[in-house]
């Protein structure tokens, strides 16, 4: 029976997978998403969490050739439209992301740049609570970050 088959399907890990996180917050784990369109759509999923503080943690997108700067600018811009707090990961990689967010006049005191995912989670832990939802978007290995 088709209904039974569909009901028994398991979501693909790290693809918009919803989990509990720090201090009772909600985590949208989209760590395996590394394409521009999918990353923007993941932010749109985040936007649907009404009455919650919205956070994104992302190193941006890589290996896009001449499109890389523009795609990361667009990701930062869209994050600024949706999020209350933004944490970019990678000191040297985050410039186009930050430019995009700042083009929307995102408050600088709500924008953080972490050197690693570990540091990003430490920053996040400072304001995580049951009314917070965080999107973990594209979990790059540390060798790409700086």
Each language-model region and where it sits:
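ATP-dependent carboxylate-amine ligase
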Residues: 3-146
């Amino acid at each position: 029976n088709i209904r039974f088959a569909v009901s028994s399907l398991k979501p693909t890990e790290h693809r918009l997978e919803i989990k509990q996180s720090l201090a009772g917050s909600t985590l949208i784990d989209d760590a395996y998403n590394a394409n521009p369109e999918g990353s923007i759509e993941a932010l749109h999923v985040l936007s649907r969490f009404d009455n919650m503080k919205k956070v994104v943690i992302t190193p941006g997108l890589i290996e896009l050739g001449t499109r890389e700067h523009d795609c990361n600018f667009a990701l930062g811009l869209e994050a600024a439209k949706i999020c209350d707090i933004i944490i970019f990961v990678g000191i040297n990689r985050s410039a186009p992301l930050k430019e995009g967010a700042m083009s929307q006049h995102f408050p600088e005191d709500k924008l953080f740049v972490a050197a690693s995912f570990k540091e990003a989670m430490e920053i996040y832990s400072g304001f995580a609570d049951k009314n917070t939802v965080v999107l973990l978007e594209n979990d790059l290995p540390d060798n790409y970050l700086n």
